[in-house]
Structures are given as C-alpha cells and as structure tokens.
Amino acid sequence: MLVLFGLSCCVRGCLNACKHYSQDSISASSQPLDSIQQHALWVDSLLSQPHVPIAVRERPSGRFVTRFRTEQIFMDSFPDLNDVQLATAQRLGIPAVADREEASRLRNRLVYVGECPYYLVDKLTYSTPYLVPRAARLLEEICHGFADSLMSRGMPLYRPVVTSLLRTQADVARLRCVNGNASEQSCHQYGTTFDICYNRFVRVIDPADTLTKDVWPGELKALLAEVICDHRQKGTCYVKYEIYQSCFHITAR
C-alpha cells in the first residue's frame, strides 16, 4: 500500500508541473471568456484540490447496492453524444494534427500518459499516449476514486484499462478503415478525451493476501460507473457509454 501511494505522489508531481498551462492559456486570451472556458477554469480549480485519504476497513458482508443494473441505466446515465463533447474538445484542446510527427511538436502542451498506480494503458494501435493536462488530471482522479471505493469496501485493488487517448488525423483514418462506427470528427484529436474499458480490470496482487477472492467483473464495472457518474454530475466531464467499444468515452470539461 505504501508503494501505491508513493508512486501516486510521483504521478501527482508530474501533473502539477504543468497543471497551470491550461489555466494560463485561457486567462491570457485577449478575448472575453465564453461559457466553456469559464467552466474549464472552475474544473481546474476543483481538480487541483488535494486528494483526501480514506479510511480502509474490512469488507462488509454482501454486495454493495448500485443503481447500475441494466444496459439501459448505463446508457441513460452517460448520454453525452459526440457533438456535445466535440464542442468542448475543440475549444479546450490542442489543434487537430495530421500525424504523430506533428503531434510531437505540441508535446509542451501535452502530458505523457503511461502506466501508473491507478490504471493501466493498453497497447495503443490507433492513438498515442498523450492528453492535455486537464484531461490527464481527470483520468487520474477517476481511477484514484475507483481505488478509494474499492478500499473503502474492503475489496482487493484493481486497475482499469485505458484503451484510447490522443488520435491524429492519420490515426482516425486508419481506425475508420476497420471500424465503420468511428467518427471522422473524433474528440480524441484534441487531447481532451480518453476511453476507459469497463470489462477489463487488472488485480493488484498483494503477496500477503491469500484469502480475498476476486471481485465479479460486473461489480467492478458498476463501481467504476458510480465514480464516473459522480464526476459527470460535478461537471468535470462529459461521458458516453459505448456498447460496441465496451468503454466509457470521456471528455474533460
């Protein structure tokens, strides 16, 4: 557990090193702030608050009660379509870039997203591991909150899998060759958007724990949904529940 929280400090330090970029770039604009930018400044202030530690306790008997019991409830709870997310992504993200070479020239505006204590990054075929600072902070907060929820219930720790991050125009074109449902106007092109798989979780092995059983995947999915739903209700993100891609499609606001 000490290793987990020690590594978290490293992750937090990397994000704090560039956390003021998005705030400064918005504040430095000579134009009046629109509603999207004003909301983004509020989200930045919210995400910059220290993460409050939780008390770890023994797992209570029985399953936890969740509102997420059917596919329809998931879809109704996360209804934010592409056009809603796209307007925010275009306003707050980087310009869409043609290819990864061009994206590399914007790395001073991006945060590298790699494996961390709270999530794993899948092998990325159609995206590259970068996000704007606000989105990177949001991703960590969601997955940190998921770990907190597990520990507060006495469950073993699991890490969700991130399956998509920044996409170039070339990435989008290649993806559309194999996935006809992929949008040409992808929010992923602006570095504000990421996908978290809802049916793949990797357990954090504790050598000292030989008794705790694995958690049912549906229970993990519902618990992750609870955390993401809380963030959406706070106004930190837009979320679409993707059935065919088996992921939560999330854009930082």
PLM features: residue spans?
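Extended, low-complexity, intrinsically disordered C-terminal regulatory tails
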Residues: 140-143, 147, 155-177
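Active-site acidic/histidine clusters and adjacent loop/turn architecture
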Residues: 106-155
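Hydrophobic membrane-insertion alpha-helices, especially the h-region
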Residues: 1-13
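Stable alpha-helical elements in mature extracytoplasmic
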Residues: 39-42, 60, 131-138, 142, ...
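Second-shell loop/turn segments in exported
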Residues: 121-134, 160-162, 206-218, 251-252
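N-terminal low-complexity, intrinsically disordered segments
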Residues: 59-100
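Catalytic cores and adjacent binding grooves of peptidoglycan-active enzymes
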Residues: 183-253
